[in-house]
């Protein structure tokens, strides 16, 4: 099944999109924040403002031109203004899941992957993001939802959960005048 953006156009491999919540009133798109003792923003969070689109995220898969459901993806933020503290990788900030089950960005080239453990799956007429421990396309049983968990500083952390996914939609990030 080919996935579509808010305009009804297919999601294209290698293109950047804002990942936005379907539900209103609980925050906006996804971005990076400092959590814990981080000196540089490395944690993927939902913005507190529902009017904020967050950061554009590039969706990439080795399999097809169009992004379909249940295919392995890498997801990486592509901020227009690089974070100086991220050094050489500031233009491509690939997502990964840490042992804490929080989604963070890879801190080194060694942690980055050619194709990733994430997938987009249809969910209640929209979509959800999932994390799959197995990189095989046929192991859907190994996939768990990505949802929101609120920490002590009221950050809306993107985390691996059993159930209660963040239901999302995709808006093109490269439209003239939008950025």
Curated annotation (Swiss-Prot):
Listed GO CC annotations: extracellular region
GO molecular function per UniProt: serine-type endopeptidase inhibitor activity
Tissue expr: Abundant in dry seeds.
This protein's UniProt keywords: Disulfide bond, Protease inhibitor, Pyrrolidone carboxylic acid, Secreted, Serine protease inhibitor
Location in or out of the cell: Secreted
Keyword Secreted attributed: yes
Marked site positions, Reactive bond for trypsin: 64-65
Subunit structure comment from the entry: Heterodimer of an alpha and a beta chain linked by a disulfide bond.
Its biological purpose: Inhibits trypsin, plasmin, human plasma kallikrein, chymotrypsin and factor XIIa activity.
Note: There are two isoforms of the beta chain with slightly different molecular masses: 4764 and 4765 Da. These isoforms differ in their N- and C-terminal amino acids.
Family, as annotated: Belongs to the protease inhibitor I3 (leguminous Kunitz-type inhibitor) family.
Protein name: Trypsin inhibitor
Organism: Leucaena leucocephala
Lineage: Eukaryota, Viridiplantae, Streptophyta, Embryophyta, Tracheophyta
């Amino acid at each position: 099944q080919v996935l579509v953006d808010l305009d009804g156009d297919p999601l294209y491999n290698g293109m950047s999109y804002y990942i936005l919540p379907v539900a209103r009133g609980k925050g906006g798109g996804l971005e990076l924040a400092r959590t814990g003792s981080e000196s540089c923003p490395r944690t993927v969070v939902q913005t507190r403002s529902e009017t904020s689109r967050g950061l554009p995220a590039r969706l990439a898969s080795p399999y097809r031109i169009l992004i379909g459901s249940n295919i392995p993806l890498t997801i990486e933020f592509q901020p227009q203004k690089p974070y100086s503290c991220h050094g050489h990788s500031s233009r491509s900030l690939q997502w990964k899941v840490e042992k804490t089950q929080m989604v963070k960005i890879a801190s080194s080239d060694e942690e980055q992957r050619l194709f990733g453990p994430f997938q987009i799956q249809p969910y209640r007429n929209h979509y959800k993001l999932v994390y799959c421990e197995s990189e095989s396309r046929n192991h859907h049983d190994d996939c768990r939802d990505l949802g929101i968990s609120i920490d002590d500083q009221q950050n809306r952390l993107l985390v691996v959960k059993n159930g209660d996914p963040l239901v999302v939609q995709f808006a093109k990030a490269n439209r003239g005048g939008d950025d």
